[in-house]
């Protein structure tokens, strides 16, 4: 149950960066800041590392001009991390949350970030600390369960489709000198990005001619 008095929220970014990672950050902050239940929205520097070290920045204090730059910036404005939550981190994390009066946590990330969000939710409940946790999907792999398309996938899919089409034209131009081009894309155990390489095809002769996905 939400407190009658406004309390603070914390946002963290983690995992690999996507072209729209900072767009999600901006959306979370602007929406949270407009809530009557939230007083201040903080950002954790380098994700979970920043939480453990208590390194936060006040995101509600940033000007609209600053946010316009952040939304269009590549990378992760808050800094990202690959560090996973460990059981021994629990006392320190809850202590920091209590010190900063953090009652709402927004994690922006993919599989590992969603796992961290779930762990923090369980830990806060087991330790009797009131914390609402929400994960904002972020993965170019597009492999989050029950998520039709994750922010970051569309931009990367477009890039790969154009790259495949361009590589095909290059190979055609080179003729016998370099008739075959092999492109390896990211995606972990999902073939969504590989499949996206065909999005720019207009006729059968256009590249790619063979697509290999892990599901098949």
What do these predicted regions represent?
Residues 14-16, 44-49, 82-83, 110-111, ...:
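Short, ordered loop/turn segments at secondary-structure junctions
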Residues 8-18, 76-80, 103-109, 135, ...:
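Short glycine-rich or small-residue beta-strand-to-loop segments that form or flank ligand, phosphate
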Residues 1-2, 51-103, 112-113, 140, ...:
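Glycine-rich oxoanion-binding loops at beta->alpha junctions
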Residues 2-55:
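N-terminal phosphate-binding or glycine-rich loops at protein starts, especially the Walker A/P-loop
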Residues 18-28, 51-52, 86-91, 111-119, ...:
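Short glycine/serine/threonine-rich phosphate/pyrophosphate-binding segments
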Residues 1-5, 10, 34-36, 68-72, ...:
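Solvent-exposed alpha-helices and their adjacent loops that cap or buttress functional pockets
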Residues 96, 107-109, 116-130, 134, ...:
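Accessory alpha-helical/coil subdomains and C-terminal extensions
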Residues 41, 72-80, 205-213:
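Short beta-strand elements in bilobed, periplasmic/extracellular small-molecule ligand-binding domains
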């Amino acid at each position: 149950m939400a407190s009658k008095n406004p309390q603070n929220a914390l946002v963290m970014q983690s995992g690999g960066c996507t072209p729209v990672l900072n767009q999600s950050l901006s959306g979370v902050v602007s929406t949270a800041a407009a809530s009557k239940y939230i007083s201040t929205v903080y950002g954790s520097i380098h994700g979970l590392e920043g939480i453990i070290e208590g390194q936060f920045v006040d995101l509600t204090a940033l000007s609209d001009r600053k946010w316009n730059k952040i939304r269009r910036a590549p990378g992760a404005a808050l800094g990202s991390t690959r560090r996973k939550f460990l059981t021994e981190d629990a006392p320190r994390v809850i202590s920091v949350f209590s010190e900063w009066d953090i009652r709402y946590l927004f994690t922006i990330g993919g599989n590992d970030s969603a796992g961290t969000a779930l762990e923090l939710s369980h830990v806060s409940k087991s330790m009797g600390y009131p914390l609402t946790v929400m994960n904002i999907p972020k993965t170019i792999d597009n492999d989050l369960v029950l998520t039709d398309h994750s922010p970051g996938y569309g931009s990367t899919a477009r890039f790969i489709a154009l790259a495949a089409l361009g590589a095909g034209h290059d190979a055609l131009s080179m003729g016998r000198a370099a008739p075959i081009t092999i492109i390896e894309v990211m995606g972990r155990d999902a073939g969504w990005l590989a499949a996206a390489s065909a999005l720019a095809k207009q006729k059968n002769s256009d590249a790619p001619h063979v697509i290999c996905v892990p599901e098949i």
